[in-house]
Each structure stands twice: as structure tokens, then as C-alpha cells.
């Protein structure tokens, strides 16, 4: 598998951004991938989440830092996971430019959905990203009228959805110490995150093979297990 750089971004805070970044990095470690975790969010929660790895069997496969440099493109790690700050500043823009995939977690509310148009347009025009490189992860969508409106906005905008993750009581929504995996998630709770990891890997492979249609890139299909 080629190196994959994933940035997790939304200009709106409190949408599950760091939780997704933490669990993606941990899944990669469990699958024996070398992981570089880059914490660009001043809150430092992404860094704090991995404190338990210092004395674990994963320590030889993992390192963390709080800066992003051009030389990271040549880093030996298999997965680079970047937790962006909740603002479209120069730090986030550099991460968006650097990443292969920009995962955008969204809740069924106006504030997490409103930046999508500007973000997509800027990423496409300024950094040459394709729509396929900016998948959404839906969090907490249900049968409510607000979720229906949010789904309509997503469909009308043509935004690809990588995964739809319900909120489970076993997963803290806002984490201060993100020891998610060590808490022992139930299999049902882990599944959507494992699906997201697999779909990202598959999407990157498809784009590398020249697939350009956004629906084909993110369609269900064979991928890394």
C-alpha cells in the first residue's frame, strides 16, 4: 500500500473531528501500519489521546508531532493523520494542500454544513483537489427533519459521503483524552470507523489507478480488510 495522508477538517468545532482522527490512526496501528500523527489543533487533544502508546507495543510504529513540513511527504510512515484546527487559517490550508484525502465530519446542523461550498471551491481552485478528495463523514444523522434537510444539502451539492456514523453512548463525542481503542469499543461501534479506514484506502487506490468519477471512487467494493 502506498503512503496515505489524511487531514480531518471542519471549520466548525465540536463535530467529532479529533475523535475520527484518533480512531483512524489507531486502526492503522492495529493493522500494523506505521503512523505519523500530526496535531495542528491548539487544543492538543490529538496528542493527548496517544499518551498511552508511549509504553505500548505500538511505539515502534508510531510518532507524533505538532508541525507539518514539506519533508513529511518523504516520511517513512504508511499513514499520516492530521488533526486540523477548526478554522480555515494558513495552518489548515497547508494541511489541505498536503493531504491526499480531506475528511470533513458534519453534523445535521447549519454551522457544520455551511463551510462546505467555500471549502470545496477553494480546495479545487487553489490546490487542484478533486471533489473525490473531500469526502464527508456524517455524524449523528437520524430520521429528524433537520437531518433530512442536511441530507438534501449534501445530495444537492454532490458531496461524496465516505461513512455515516451514528452516535453511540460508548463513544465520547468530545474527547479530552482520546483513549478510544483502549476503552474497548463494542464491535458495532468500531465497524463504521473500520469501514471508513477501508474506504479511504480503496479510494486512494482507485484515484491512483485513474478513476475520476466521484461515485466510482467512493462506491462500495473490494478494499483492504
What is each PLM-predicted segment?
Residues 9-15, 30-80, 86, 176:
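P-loop/Walker-type NTP enzyme "switch/lid" segment
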Residues 118-128:
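Conserved C-terminal guanine-recognition region of P-loop GTPase G domains, centered on the G4
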Residues 140-182:
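Beta-strand-loop-alpha "switch" segments that mediate conformational coupling across diverse proteins
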Residues 2-6:
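Extreme N-terminal starter segment of soluble prokaryotic enzymes
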Residues 19-20:
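Hydrophobic positions on the alpha1 helix immediately C-terminal to the Walker A/P-loop
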Residues 169-201:
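Inter-lobe coupling/hinge region of RecA-like P-loop helicase motors
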Residues 91-110:
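Inter-motif core of Ras-like GTPase G domains
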Residues 25, 29-30, 96:
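Gly/Ala-rich phosphate-binding loop of Rossmann-like dinucleotide-binding domains
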Amino acid at each position: 500500500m502506498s503512503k496515505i495522508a489524511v487531514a480531518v477538517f471542519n471549520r466548525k468545532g465540536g463535530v467529532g473531528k479529533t475523535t475520527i482522527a484518533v480512531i483512524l490512526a489507531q486502526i492503522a496501528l492495529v493493522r500494523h501500519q506505521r503512523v505519523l500523527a500530526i496535531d495542528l489543533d491548539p487544543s492538543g487533544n490529538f496528542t493527548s489521546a496517544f499518551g498511552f502508546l508511549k509504553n505500548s507495543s505500538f511505539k515502534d510504529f508510531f510518532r507524533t508531532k505538532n508541525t507539518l513540513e514539506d519533508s513529511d511527504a518523504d516520511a517513512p510512515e504508511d499513514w499520516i493523520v492530521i488533526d486540523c484546527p477548526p478554522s480555515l487559517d494558513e495552518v489548515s490550508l497547508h494541511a489541505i494542500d498536503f493531504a491526499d484525502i480531506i475528511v470533513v465530519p458534519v453534523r445535521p446542523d447549519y454551522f457544520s454544513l455551511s463551510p462546505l461550498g467555500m471549502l470545496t471551491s477553494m480546495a479545487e481552485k487553489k490546490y487542484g483537489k478533486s471533489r473525490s478528495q473531500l469526502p464527508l463523514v456524517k455524524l449523528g444523522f437520524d430520521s429528524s427533519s433537520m437531518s433530512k434537510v442536511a441530507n438534501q444539502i449534501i445530495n444537492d451539492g454532490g458531496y461524496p459521503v465516505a461513512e455515516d456514523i451514528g452516535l453511540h453512548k460508548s463513544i465520547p463525542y468530545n474527547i479530552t483524552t482520546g483513549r478510544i481503542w483502549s476503552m474497548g469499543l463494542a464491535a458495532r461501534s468500531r465497524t463504521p470507523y473500520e469501514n471508513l479506514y477501508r474506504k479511504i484506502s480503496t479510494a486512494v487506490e482507485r484515484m491512483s489507478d485513474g478513476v475520476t468519477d466521484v461515485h466510482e471512487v467512493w462506491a462500495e467494493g473490494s478494499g483492504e480488510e
